[in-house]
Amino acid sequence: MNPAPNLVMIGPMGAGKSCIGRRLAERFGLDFVDVDQAIVEQVGSSIPAIFEQHGEARFRQHEAEALHGLLAQSNKLVSTGGGAILDAGNRQRIRERGFVVYLHVSVPAQLTRLARDRNRPLLQRPDREQVLHGMAALRTPLYQEVADLTLETDHLSPAEATAQLVLRLAAQWRMSSTPA
């Protein structure tokens, strides 16, 4: 089984963290928690409203607080927001308290998946593609820095991605529990 207290899903928006995370949590008997949803419940406002009323910096504070509290627990599958890894403290906490799965998705696939999504404050601009490329350039090395396992999700359905992760996680966890 997972040698870490939690399983943590990281990756850009549109990678499938929440959808695949729910499926994995059910498969492994973990409690699924979406950090963005936890923020909404704690603050009592939607993510777009938090960005509009208080700005991204305040949202990131809420995100760090929620992530810290969730990762203090065990037996959780924690689905992070795409920008959670921007904070060095978040990256450290994620590594310390979770086995980290990085779901990678290309910008063209993100554009397709997020075409009708109006709940992403950072994408409410006409230059969505440029914004996503900029985010990828900044964030991809940070995702790679903390990832224990990476899965490319561009051409996978949620069911296919989940099936691949179940096999890869089981193999990884077996290897980590085998005496040297």
UniProtKB/Swiss-Prot annotation:
One of its GO terms (molecular function) is ATP binding. It is found in: Cytoplasm. Pathway: Metabolic intermediate biosynthesis; chorismate biosynthesis; chorismate from D-erythrose 4-phosphate and phosphoenolpyruvate: step 5/7. It is an enzyme of class 2 (transferase). Substrate binds at D36, R60, G82, R139. CDD domains: SK (cd00464). ATP binds at G14, A15, G16, K17, S18, C19, R120. Signal peptide: none annotated. Its EC number is 2.7.1.71. Its main location: cytoplasm. It comes from the Bacteria. Mg(2+) binds at S18. Binds 1 Mg(2+) ion per subunit. InterPro entries: P-loop_NTPase, Shikimate/glucono_kinase, Shikimate_kinase/TSH1, Shikimate_kinase_CS. Monomer. Catalyzes the specific phosphorylation of the 3-hydroxyl group of shikimic acid using ATP as a cosubstrate. This is Shikimate kinase. It comes from Xanthomonas campestris pv. campestris (strain ATCC 33913 / DSM 3586 / NCPPB 528 / LMG 568 / P 25). The gene is aroK.
